[in-house]
C-alpha cells in the first residue's frame, strides 16, 4: 500500500513544506476524529482536476461509517462537487444524505468538508463522515464539548494555524481524547471536564469538582514540585494570552503521575480558550521504574560475572607461569583466552540496556590479545572486514567463542613454522536473515584427508558443538581459492532451525 508521501509525490507537485504540513495534519487528525465521532478522508487535487484520497482516519470514540479503505481512490471532480468547490473557494461546507444523490458519497451519512490551508493555498480538503441521525440528534455534555473543540480545530486547520510544526513529535505519545479532556475558556476557567479527566484530578488529590474552577488555582496546590507547579502556571497563562504553544508534560501530584498535553485554540486571530488532554500514567510509570530496576540489576550481575571471570583468568595465567610442563602451560593459556572472551561479552552486556551485544566492538577488543596468548613466535596480522552487527545475549557469547576459537586455530596450525609472518581475516556479511562469517588465513591450506567431523582438536570440537547446539547454524571448511583456508560459518539472525551448507 502506498504511503502518504508516495501518493503526494505521484499525484501532486506540492512543495516540500506543504507536504510536511500534510504529514503533520495526519499526525494530529486522530484527535480530530475522536472529538468529532466521525471518519475523515484527506483529498488532494491533481493538475487535471481529478481528486485523489491520500489518507483515512477512523474514530476511537464511535462506530465508523466508511467501512472500505478509501486510500488511493481516484474520482472525477464532478463526482464530489462540494470537495471541488472547497478547493476552488476555500470555504467549508456540508452535504446531507439528500444532497449526496449526485455525489459519489451516497450511503446515507452526512459529509462535511473543510479546507487544509498552507500559507495562502488550499493544499488538501478533509471530508468528515458521520451518520445523518448523529449529526442531527441532541448531544450530551461530553459530545457537545468534544464537537465544539473539533470545530475550533477545523477552523484553525482552514486558517493554516493548526497543527503547529512543533506539535508533531509530541502528538505520537500524547493522551487521547478518551483518556481525559478539559476545555478552558479565555479566562482559564474549566468549562467542561470529562469523567476520566476528573478521575485523574482526584488521583492527584483534588477533592472538589473541576467545572467552574480556574484550572491554575485547582492544579498548582496539587503538584509536589514547586518549580514544576510554577512552570505549569506560567505555561497555562501564556497559552491563554495567545503567546504560548502546545506542550506535553508529566506532572507528579499526590502520589500520582499524569501526562498533560495543552492545545491553544486561536480562531480568526482571537483566543477562544484551550484544550487539555490528560491521562493517568501512574501505573505505567510504576512498571517503568520496575523495569529500570530490573535492567540495572541484570547489568550489575553481568558486571560481577565479568569481574569473577577476570579473576579466574588471572589465576589461570598465574598458574600457567608456574607450570613447567609445556603441554599443561599451553592448555592453561588456552583456558585464559576462552575465559577472557566470555568476560568481554559480559562486560559489553553490563553496559547494554537491551541485552544486545555489539559483536564488532567485542571482537575488536579480543583480536589484539590473540597473538599475546598464542604459542607461536611469528607475528600474525588479524583483520576484520565487514560488520557483524548486534546479537541477543543468549547467542552472542557462543558466537564470540566460535570466532575466537577459529582465529586461534588458524594462528596455531595454519602456517608453516618457518614462515616469517601470516594473516588471518574475519569477513562478515549480514542480511535480514543471515549472518555469514568467513575466517580466512593465507597459510598452508587443509591437510590432505582432513575432516572437520573427525577432528580430535578440542577447539574445533567446541566450535562444532556451539554452532549446532547454541547458534542453530552451519559450519564448513575448505581450501581458499588462491592460498590458505576458509572456514565458513552461517548463523540465522532470528531463531531458526539448523541449516546445512
UniProtKB/Swiss-Prot annotation:
Its EC number is 2.7.13.3. Was identified as a high-confidence drug target. Residues 4-150 are annotated as: GAF. The N-terminal sensor region consists of closely linked GAF and PAS domains. Binds c-di-GMP via the GAF domain. Copper and NO are detected through a dicysteine motif in the GAF domain. PANTHER family: ETHYLENE RESPONSE SENSOR PROTEIN (PTHR41523:SF8), TWO-COMPONENT SYSTEM SENSOR PROTEIN (PTHR41523). This is Sensor histidine kinase PdtaS. The gene is pdtaS. It comes from Mycobacterium tuberculosis (strain ATCC 25618 / H37Rv). It comes from the Bacteria. Residues 300-495 form the Histidine kinase domain. The lineage of its organism: Bacteria, Bacillati, Actinomycetota, Actinomycetes, Mycobacteriales. Binding to c-di-GMP activates PdtaS autophosphorylation and by extension phosphotransfer to PdtaR. At the opposite, autophosphorylation and signaling cascade are inhibited by NO, copper and zinc. Activity is not inhibited by calcium or iron. Full inhibition of PdtaR/PdtaS signaling cascade requires the transduction of a cell surface signal by the intramembrane protease Rip1. Its main location: cytoplasm. The modification Phosphohistidine is found at residue 303. Member of the two-component regulatory system PdtaR/PdtaS. This two-component system plays an essential role in mycobacterial adaptation to poor nutrient conditions. Nutrient deprivation results in increasing intracellular concentrations of cyclic diguanosine monophosphate (c-di-GMP), which binds to the PdtaS sensor and promotes its autophosphorylation, leading to the activation of the signaling cascade. The phosphate group is then transferred to PdtaR. In addition, the PdtaR/PdtaS two-component system controls copper and nitric oxide (NO) resistance downstream of the intramembrane protease Rip1. This coupled Rip1/PdtaS/PdtaR circuit controls NO resistance and acute lung infection in mice by relieving PdtaR/PdtaS-mediated repression of isonitrile chalkophore biosynthesis. Two signals are required to fully inactivate the PdtaR/PdtaS system and mediate NO resistance: a cytoplasmic inhibitory signal through the PdtaS kinase mediated by direct sensing of NO and the production of PPE1-5', an NO-induced small RNA, to sequester PdtaR. Autophosphorylated. GO terms for biological process: phosphorelay signal transduction system. Coiled coil: none annotated. GO terms for cellular component: cytoplasm. It is found in: Cytoplasm. CDD domains: HATPase_EL346-LOV-HK-like. The N-terminal sensor region is a monomer in solution, but it forms non-covalently linked dimers over time. Changing residue 303 to Q: Loss of activity, cannot rescue a deletion mutant.
Amino acid at each position: 500500500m502506498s504511503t502518504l508521501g508516495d501518493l503526494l509525490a505521484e499525484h501532486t507537485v506540492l512543495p516540500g513544506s506543504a507536504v510536511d504540513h500534510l504529514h503533520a495534519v495526519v499526525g494530529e487528525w486522530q484527535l480530530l476524529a475522536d472529538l468529532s465521532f466521525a471518519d475523515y478522508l484527506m483529498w488532494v487535487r491533481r493538475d487535471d482536476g481529478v481528486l485523489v484520497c491520500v489518507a483515512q482516519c477512523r474514530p476511537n470514540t464511535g462506530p465508523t461509517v466508511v467501512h472500505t479503505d478509501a486510500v488511493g481512490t481516484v474520482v472525477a471532480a464532478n463526482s464530489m462537487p462540494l470537495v471541488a468547490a472547497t478547493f476552488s473557494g476555500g470555504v467549508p461546507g456540508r452535504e446531507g444524505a439528500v444532497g449526496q444523490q449526485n455525489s459519489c458519497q451516497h450511503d446515507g451519512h452526512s459529509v462535511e468538508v473543510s479546507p487544509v490551508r498552507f500559507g495562502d493555498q488550499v493544499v488538501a480538503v478533509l471530508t468528515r463522515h458521520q451518520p445523518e441521525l448523529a449529526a442531527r440528534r441532541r448531544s450530551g455534555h461530553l459530545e457537545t464539548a468534544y464537537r465544539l473543540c473539533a470545530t475550533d480545530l477545523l477552523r484553525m486547520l482552514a486558517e493554516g494555524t493548526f497543527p503547529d510544526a512543533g506539535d508533531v513529535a509530541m502528538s505520537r505519545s500524547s493522551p487521547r481524547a478518551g483518556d481525559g479532556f478539559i476545555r478552558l475558556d479565555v479566562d482559564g476557567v474549566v468549562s467542561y471536564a470529562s469523567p476520566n479527566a476528573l478521575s485523574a484530578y482526584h488521583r492527584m488529590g483534588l477533592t472538589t469538582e473541576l467545572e467552574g474552577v480556574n484550572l491554575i488555582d485547582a492544579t498548582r496546590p496539587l503538584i509536589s514540585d514547586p518549580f514544576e507547579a510554577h512552570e505549569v502556571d506560567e505555561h497555562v497563562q501564556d497559552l491563554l494570552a495567545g503567546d504560548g504553544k502546545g506542550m506535553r508534560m508529566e506532572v507528579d501530584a499526590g502520589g500520582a503521575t499524569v501526562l498533560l498535553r495543552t492545545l491553544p485554540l486561536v480562531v480568526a486571530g482571537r483566543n477562544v480558550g484551550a484544550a487539555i488532554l490528560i491521562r493517568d500514567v501512574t501505573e505505567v510509570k510504576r512498571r517503568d521504574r520496575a523495569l529500570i530496576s530490573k535492567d540495572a540489576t541484570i547489568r550489575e550481575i553481568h558486571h560481577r560475572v565479568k569481574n569473577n571471570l577476570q579473576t579466574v583468568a588471572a589465576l589461570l595465567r598465574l598458574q600457567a607461569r608456574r607450570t613447567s610442563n609445556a603441554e599443561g602451560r599451553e592448555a592453561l593459556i588456552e583456558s585464559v583466552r576462552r575465559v577472557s572472551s566470555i568476560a568481554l561479552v559480559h562486560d559489553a552486556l553490563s553496559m547494554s540496556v537491551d541485552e544486545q551485544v555489539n559483536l564488532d566492538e567485542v571482537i575488536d577488543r579480543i583480536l589484539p590479545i590473540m597473538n599475546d596468548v598464542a604459542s607461536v613466535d611469528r607475528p600474525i596480522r588479524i583483520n576484520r572486514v565487514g560488520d557483524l552487527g548486534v546479537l541477543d545475549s543468549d547467542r552472542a557469547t557462543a558466537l564470540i567463542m566460535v570466532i575466537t576459537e577459529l582465529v586461534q586455530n588458524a594462528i596455531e596450525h595454519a602456517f608453516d613454522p618457518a614462515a616469517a609472518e601470516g594473516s588471518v581475516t574475519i569477513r562478515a556479511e549480514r542480511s535480514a536473515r543471515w549472518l555469514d562469517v568467513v575466517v580466512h588465513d593465507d597459510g598452508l591450506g587443509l591437510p590432505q584427508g582432513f575432516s572437520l567431523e573427525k577432528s580430535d582438536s578440542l577447539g574445533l570440537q567446541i566450535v562444532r558443538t556451539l554452532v549446532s547446539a547454541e547458534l542453530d547454524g552451519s559450519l564448513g571448511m575448505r581450501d581458499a581459492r588462491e592460498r590458505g583456508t576458509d572456514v565458513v560459518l552461517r548463523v540465522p539472525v532470528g531463531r531458526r532451525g539448523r541449516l546445512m551448507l
